[in-house]
Amino acid sequence: MAEPGEQLPEEVLALIFRHLPLPDRAAAARVCRAWAAAATCSAVWHDTSISCDCELEGMLPPYLSACLDHVQNLWLEFEPSRKSSRRAATDLLTALTGRTPGLRGLCLECRGEKPLFDAGRDVLDAVHALCGAASALRHLDLRRLPFSLDDALVLQVAHGCPELRSLFLDNRTLVGSVGPGSVLELLEACPCLRALGLHLASLSRTALEALAAPERAPFELLALRCACPEDARAPPLPDEAWAALSLRHPGLQVELELEPVLPAESVTRVLQPAVPVATLRLSLSGDTVGPVRFAARHYAATLRALEVRAAASAELDAALEELAARCARLREVHCFCVVRPSVLHAFRARCPRLRSYTLKVTREPHPWRPTLVA
């Protein structure tokens, strides 16, 4: 009688196994010879997600280790407060360092809180070494690492990964340690970069001018997070530099996230009329009404998503209604305070492309879930 796996072609089994989590892939490989061959073929491992909780215990040698050469895009999750999870993540990154000819994408995500005063040197050193060896890396996402990223890491990425297409450094650390000089060097070393996430303090007028250079490849996304004291003290980026960048890259989308650390005068410096803002997230400790009105009057042609965290007020309701009337291309709006019914009606009536919204007209228990528009 044929083994169960021999009834299906290896290509079909591979399509199934590629969607299995790591423990289930290991279990499938133990069923029979045909399943073992399918579970370890390259197609199964091109896009791999690994959670470093129980998944790596005893599995790196030999099962996972034998498949590392096949990994092209890796999403790696770990808990920084758990030594076993953290060690598993750094061990895996270290193992990849010597076997990275095919690695194209890396996304790291921390789950839970990191220990107090933890600089994450073990994790960052492993990432640093990996970027020095992964010359074909095209996508690096460090947004969900809770550690301060520095110039040394950015320069390692710049010179070790010349094929880079996207780099996201706009994480939630409260200290900005990436200087404008290293970002400029990154742009010079990676001419194909088309998406970049930074803290505001890491960006300079010179970098905007470099992105607007005639020989530059099309640039598509710039995500800016303003959340640490360095961001609040950052010099203004002139409106004319933004205008030149938008002219050079008409498809450019800018994501702006403004956090409570920004005083009102800093918000005014950041919100320049010529910035092609597609996504605006406002979580300010001061005035929110002014920025919402500014967005309504200057970003009507580009704004696609708005998120507001503020105290409810009649002035905010009026500003939101003005934005609904002007920003007809809006696809998402999420306001995490109670609004009057006319605000909900304004967005439903004036924004025909709206696909998702969080607009509560009465108090409800949290978490608030968005409403999807059919």
From Swiss-Prot:
SUPFAM superfamilies: F-box domain, RNI-like. Keywords: Ubl conjugation pathway. Residues 2-48 form the F-box domain. Coiled coil: none annotated. InterPro entries: F-box-like_dom_sf (IPR036047), F-box_dom (IPR001810), LRR_dom_sf (IPR032675). PROSITE patterns: FBOX. Substrate-recognition component of the SCF (SKP1-CUL1-F-box protein)-type E3 ubiquitin ligase complex. Directly interacts with SKP1 and CUL1. This is F-box/LRR-repeat protein 8. It comes from Bos taurus (Bovine).
